[in-house]
Amino acid sequence: MSDARFADGLRYRIEIPSVEGPRVFEAVLDEAERRAVPVRRISQGSGVMMLTDGEISEMARLGADAGVEVSLFLGPRGAWDTGGQSLVTAAAGGVARGDAGIADSLAEVRRGVALGIRSFLVADLGVLKVLGDLRRAGELPSSLVLKTSVLLPCGNASTAVALEGLGATTINVATDLSPSELGELRAACSAPLDVYVEVPDDQGGFVRFYEVPEIVRLAAPVYVKLGLRNAPNIYPSGLHVEDLAVKLGRERVRRAELVLRLLAERTPELVEGRGEDHPADLGIPEP
């Protein structure tokens, strides 16, 4: 049993991933209000480079108004670059290639921060170290959330400690860890764990709704993430797939409602509300 909590005392928060732009974000917020789902973080996977300044600013405004963290992915990355290794193994898909890749990622962080974003998804160890060092040196906001990506999966306690030491504020775990293994990570580190309870097909495709109570008990504080299996990969997103991205975003919120209903039915003692409007550990935008 974990006694650790988020800054506002909660054991878990709801995260909706793959929110690819302001129109999708608006749809997620609308669906969350309609279904009474307390979404506290949205994350995006196409990357800062795939959003205009206006789109980033609008997402920052929406997040600030709703009290929702907005986490944008850093790139470019191996899977979209000229490297051939990512074509034969997904393990290289998130890496920043060469010093130029590190510099490009840093440029994306500085751009996002200037537009009000206070949370970024990091899929490369070198990028994480550089950003962690800059935050400690005061060259990036002290409130900046560095969220490791599922493309940089954490599968054991020692890795969790290493990631936290490099600067990770919140840690995406490997999608196939058991509740007891998640408990081992929790015993070793203080960073919240990001746990997919419905996993995209390209990350395993598991649906783990019935495990949520035990995950919360053993690994709190956790971000309960709702991916979608049996759904297309829409990265990099854009206007050509925006209607689909909106529908996928709404369905992720519906999936979250299903998880919360099950939690209330089976373990009502774990049911919690939305928490504080602006908890200190949430990367709410500052436009």
Segments predicted by a language model, with ranges:
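Conserved nucleotide-cofactor-binding alpha/beta core module
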Residues: 156-158
